[in-house]
Amino acid sequence: MPRPFIEQNVTWLYSDDLDTHAAFYRDVLELPQVLDQGVCRVFQVSPTGFLGVCNKEGRPRGTKGMMVTFLVENVEETYRYLLGKGVEFDGPPNMLGGRTVYSAFFKDPIGYWLEIQEFNDPRWPYPPGRGPRRG
């Protein structure tokens, strides 16, 4: 039997301050909020990818061991845009992984690590019409 197709995915982050956490993704990163469940809010990251922030009883605690990476078409452009929105980065964009990854890191208001990233690897399943930008 073949593996059933996975249509969409949601990454969940947990918070003690749901309003501040949700406002960052809605107002700073400008992700459209697609669902408000009261204790959880869900934002659309891409046509099939979603990010949820939650404050509910019995939830996992802490931000270590978790990072969300947003693959973007142009890291420098996104970096400048987010700087203009007040985002504080860990440093400027940098080439990593033997020149296969170009990225910059920052934290959301709760302390989760976030990354904006471009892959520079022809093996990556790029969106239609795209491929590595960097030589």
What are these regions (language model features)?
Residues 49-53, 60, 111-113:
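Short, charged/polar, Gly/Pro-enriched secondary-structure boundary elements
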Residues 17-18, 68-113:
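Vicinal oxygen chelate
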Residues 39, 49, 64-66, 85:
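A generic structural signal for short beta-strands and their flanking turns/coil linkers
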Residues 32-37, 94-97, 118-124:
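Conserved catalytic-core motifs of GNAT/GCN5-like acyltransferases
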